[in-house]
């Protein structure tokens, strides 16, 4: 995949070249999207909109730390949707990991989560965030046990995953309504890189075959159900809903 690669570390140790080789990235000076290695982290920038800033994965500080410490925990919509109750903490595959937020929430309340991400740039950002998270004194121990990354396309990888999880989560990129200059800066940068998941409808069936208990699909409130398969079961929040489908028992 082509992207502009920028090293701002000043270390001169070739770390960016190693990273590019690992994720199959090719430097393209004219690309509007840039993957930047800073002294602190790896980040994604949209070069024609510098005001948007850089997007990076941070499990240790910022919004994620706040959500972990002060968020709803088991009361969060995604936790309710996967069916966490009492001692039941399902094994989860997050088949469209994105920046790992929902996966991290589930891991922080005790679920073991395997994240799948097919876009190599997003996978590189996740991997960088995980490495820093694993090294953190406060959360590193449980994070290593509960949150892992698999760089693979969900469409091909879902049939190969063992052991089967109890729950599969899907959150395909859906085109945002035009009116939203409100669309978060992050979404704008992200959509420029990834675009809408045009093949997302093909994920529902393999996800249902893989999950032993249920599939949870996160949708904007205005979006139709995935693959136009309606379900009466959903956890509804402001702006989103988590549609719930039966999996395939062992």
Swiss-Prot record:
Domain of life (superkingdom): Bacteria
Transmembrane region(s): none
Annotated EC: 2.1.1.242
Keywords: Cytoplasm, Methyltransferase, rRNA processing, S-adenosyl-L-methionine, Transferase
GO molecular function: rRNA (guanine-N2-)-methyltransferase activity
Gene3D superfamilies with a match to the protein in the record: Vaccinia Virus protein VP39 (3.40.50.150), YhiQ-like domain (3.40.1630.10)
Gene Ontology cellular component terms for the protein in this record: cytoplasm
Entry keyword Protein biosynthesis: no
Family annotation (InterPro entries): 16SrRNA_methylTrfase_J (IPR007536), SAM-dependent_MTases_sf (IPR029063)
Binding site for S-adenosyl-L-methionine: 101-102, 117-118, 153-154, 171
Enzyme's top EC category: transferase
UniProt cross-references to PANTHER family, sorted A to Z: RIBOSOMAL RNA SMALL SUBUNIT METHYLTRANSFERASE J
Protein name: Ribosomal RNA small subunit methyltransferase J
Originating organism: Escherichia coli (strain UTI89 / UPEC)
Gene symbol of the encoding locus: rsmJ
């Amino acid at each position: 995949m082509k992207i502009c690669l920028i090293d701002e570390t000043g270390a001169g140790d070739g770390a960016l070249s190693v990273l590019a080789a690992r994720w199959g990235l090719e430097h393209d000076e004219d690309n509007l999207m840039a993957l930047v290695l800073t002294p602190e982290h790896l980040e994604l920038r949209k070069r024609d909109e510098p005001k948007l800033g850089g997007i990076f994965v941070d499990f240790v500080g910022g919004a994620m730390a706040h959500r972990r410490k002060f968020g709803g925990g088991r009361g969060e919509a995604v936790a309710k949707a996967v069916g966490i109750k009492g001692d039941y903490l399902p094994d989860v595959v997050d088949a469209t990991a994105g920046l790992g937020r929902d996966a991290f929430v589930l891991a922080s309340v005790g679920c073991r989560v395997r994240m799948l991400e097919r876009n190599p740039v997003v996978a590189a950002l996740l991997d960088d965030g995980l490495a820093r998270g694993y090294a953190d004194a406060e959360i590193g121990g449980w994070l290593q046990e509960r949150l892992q990354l698999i760089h693979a396309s969900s469409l091909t990888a879902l049939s190969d995953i063992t052991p089967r999880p109890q729950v599969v989560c899907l959150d395909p990129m859906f085109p945002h309504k035009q009116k939203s200059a409100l669309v978060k800066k992050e979404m704008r940068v992200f959509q420029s890189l990834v675009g809408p998941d045009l093949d997302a409808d093909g994920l529902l069936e393999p996800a249902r075959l893989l999950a032993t208990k249920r599939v949870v699909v996160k949708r904007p409130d205005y979006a139709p159900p995935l693959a136009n398969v309606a379900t009466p079961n959903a956890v509804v929040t402001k702006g989103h809903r988590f549609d719930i489908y039966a999996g395939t028992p062992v």
